[in-house]
Amino acid sequence: MRNTTLCHIEKDGKYLMLHRIKKKNDLNHDKWVGIGGKFEECESPEQCNAREVYEETGLTLNDAKYRCVVTFVSDIWESELIHVFTAKDFFGDIKECDEGELVWINKSDIYSLPIWEGDKIFLKLIEDENYPFFSLRLQYKGEKLISAELNGKKIDFKELL
């Protein structure tokens, strides 16, 4: 299982999203995702998050909030432990990203874009800044979400999609 980070950078009611269109054989190809990537040797989640955000966007985070851990289980892709952050305090100029197109998207419009079904669940939970840290397990068959557990308990995720 690989460890990754995912950061949702917010400004003026919008998230900076990455439309993954430049890499072939990418499990996120043509999907809209937050900013992130794989851990390097001996990195903490916070260090990986800051590095990945800078590498992909050119932005430096002054503060990021560690919001949840998502266990991504798939029948076709490598399992992943995704450390999810949000950030509102940052500086720098956005640069071109070699993985796709960076776009500020209204938070309410994200749900109509091609995103992973499970992302809709954790995005709704992290919209509440006071929602406590949580663990979310998402199991997929292909690109179809087939089960979800919040803090170890199965949830009826279809209500949240």
Name each region found by the language model:
Residues 16-17, 24-27:
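Short N-terminal binding/cap micro-motifs at the start of the first secondary-structure element
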Residues 68:
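Catalytic phosphate/metal-binding cores of nucleic-acid and nucleotide-processing enzymes, i.e., regions
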